[in-house]
Structure formats: structure tokens, C-alpha cells
Amino acid sequence: MTEFTTLLQQGNAWFFIPSAILLGALHGLEPGHSKTMMAAFIIAIKGTIKQAVMLGLAATISHTAVVWLIAFGGMVISKRFTAQSAEPWLQLISAVIIISTAFWMFWRTWRGERNWLENMHEHDHEHHHHDHEDHHDHGHHHHHEHGEYQDAHARAHANDIKRRFDGREVTNWQILLFGLTGGLIPCPAAITVLLICIQLKALTLGATLVVSFSLGLALTLVTVGVGAAISVQQVAKRWSGFNTLAKRAPYFSSLLIGLVGVYMGVHGFMGIMR
């Protein structure tokens, strides 16, 4: 069977480019630091669309820089393993790490939603101790406050940002600094890009894949920032599927990562068996 790197050299890299763009876009939609931090920051400072775009691009640039450093480091290390016999084992090890990453992302999302549902159930159970009028008023307030799923880390960051920046005037430099620091957090998807770049063994294709991932991430972050500037609440009211899409994004991204891992694993195993 044709080797993984040979498939890329024969012009089949087009499959990985749109996949990297999609992976970056889905990563930006996941409940986590980048999206929640940006939306909370823009809402807290009552930012403009221009400031939202600036914040999104700054976060993307810093995130891209981290991915590039990891990717180039991986490609430099991979040059030491040029022996053809070592490549299948590297593919197999990479596949195990990628599939483990996908499983961790899926499990983390599932556990977060389960804990959220349990808290909702406990909160609803407490309402039975109130009279009907009090239950109705409090239940209505509860719907607006907790009706949308958010993981614990994202909620903590949002509350901290609101406390620090609510109603304050900020400069463009502060916005850029906030975006740059917010994009430095590593992510499982970046690890996947690293492992794929190691398999590519080609600087041009590796750089293209990293840029593609960053492009997808930029599209999501800028869109989220602009959406926060023009009121995310209005978007959610007009399109009921917005919140559902955001909640399901981690499942799609974990599935995509898992498929990449399986693909690598199959080729690595076939190479070892030859």
C-alpha cells in the first residue's frame, strides 16, 4: 500500500488542507478559553466591531505562533528519523496519541454536559419547596442565567473578565495584549497539527497545514468577536440552532481528530507488517 508521505507527495494533500481549516474553525467553537474570553471581554468593554476584529486577529496570531514553533520543532526532530523502517512506528505512535486526544476531548465535553444537567436537575428540585408564584418568577430568571451550557473554566474566565473590565475604557494596545495572551493556551487540535506535520516531512506542506488550521481558527474567533459586539443574544434569538451548534462542535472536532488518527494507524500498521 502507498505510504502516507507518498500519498501527500502525489498531490493528495488537498484532503488535509480543508480538514485543517475545519479543525481550526471547530476548535474556535469549542466551549473553552478563547471564544468565551473574547466574547466576555468585548461585552464587558462594550467594544466595537473594529475592536472585535483586532482582538480575534491578535489571538489567532499568538496561537499560530505557538503552533508554528511546535510544528517546526517536530519537523526538525523528525529529520533525525529518516530511516524508512522507523517511519511506520512513528505513524503508529502518532496514531495512538491522536486517538487518545480525540477520546479525551469527547470525554471532557460529555462530562461537562453531564455535570451541567445534574446541576440543573438539583436546582429544579429546590424549586418544589417554594410556592407557585415564587417558583414561576424564579424559574423564569433561572432560564436566562443557566439555560445555556458553559464549562467551568469558561464561566470562571468570563466572570473574572467582567469584574476587571466592565464599563472601563481600554486602549487598542490593551486589546492587542489581551488577545495575544489569550491565544497562547495550547489545545489538543494544535497537538494534532504537530503530529501531522511530522508525518508530512515537507516544509511547504507542513506550513500550509498550519496556516490552514490558523485560518479556520481566525474565521471563528473574528466571527465570535463581531457577534459579541453586535450582541450575541440577538443572534441566538433569531437562530435557535446557534447554541446547539456551539455545544456540538467539540464532538465533531473529536470525531475528525479520531479519523485522522485511525488513518495514520492503518498506514503505520501496514508498513510494519510489510
Swiss-Prot record:
Gene Ontology MF terms in the entry: monoatomic cation efflux transmembrane transporter activity; nickel cation transmembrane transporter activity
Induction: By nickel and cobalt. Transcriptionally repressed by RcnR.
Top-level taxon in the UniProt lineage: Bacteria
Keyword annotations: Cell inner membrane, Cell membrane, Cobalt, Cobalt transport, Ion transport, Membrane, Nickel, Nickel transport, Transmembrane, Transmembrane helix, Transport
Residue ranges with Basic and acidic residues bias: 127-137
Annotated InterPro entries: Ni/Co_transpt_high_affinity, NiCoT_RcnA
GO cellular component, one term: plasma membrane
Pfam families (UniProt xref): NicO
Keyword NAD belongs to the record: no
UniProt keyword Hydrolase, yes or no: no
Topology class, membrane: Multi-pass membrane protein
Any single biological process term in GO: response to nickel cation
Transmembrane segments: 13-33, 57-77, 87-107, 175-195, 210-230, 252-272
Residues in the Cytoplasmic compartment per record: 34-56, 108-174, 231-251
Function recorded in the entry: Efflux system for nickel and cobalt.
Similarity field: Belongs to the NiCoT transporter (TC 2.A.52) family. RcnA subfamily.
Protein name per UniProt: Nickel/cobalt efflux system RcnA
Species assigned in the record: Escherichia coli O1:K1 / APEC
